[in-house]
Amino acid sequence: HGPGVSTEVIAEALEISQPAIFKRFGTKKDLMLAALLPPSVPAWVSALEDGPDERPIVEQLREVIRQAAAFFAETIPAMSVIRASGISKEELLASFEVAPPVVAKRTLIAWLLRSKEGGLIRPVDFEAAATMILGALQFRAFMVQIVGDAPSGAPDEDYVDDLADLLTHGLAPEVG
């Protein structure tokens, strides 16, 4: 139905009364945020705090990429609906102490630093690496949202493997 759907239609779909929606959420905006707002720390970001471990970095990157890709595949459409409903960026960010993308990037940078300390990757600009990873995942999810299909047409699992492989070679410790 999209962001313009009436609370009457929402209530009917949920098999509850319209007043029950307003009693619980107060406003349609609050309902939209409760239904669509991502968590302040998504599960994939929390998982970064436990790693990396001693497994090959390509395996660990695949896990990170797979989890983050699934998150962005859900979040990009939800954020589009939130923004299309007229909720401003400022209203959206007021829900968080620190903006979730900032938390995600900081946590990914810390994970990459620990990967370097463990000898799994070489020293690089970790902010650039984190931005590249996040950008590759967000852009793919955005393209699917906009055009309905991934830019390369490759299945998600192939994209995860290809991105992990590319990153592994780019981040590989220098030999010699």
Predicted regions span which residues?
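Amphipathic alpha-helical packing segments from all-alpha helical-bundle domains
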Residues: 73-74, 81, 90-118, 127-131, ...
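Helix-loop "lid/cap" segments that line or gate small-molecule binding pockets
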Residues: 50, 65-73, 79-88, 166-171
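Amphipathic C-terminal alpha-helical segment
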Residues: 70-71, 105, 110, 114, ...
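Alpha-helical DNA-recognition elements
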Residues: 27, 38, 114
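Conserved hydrophobic residue
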Residues: 4, 120-121
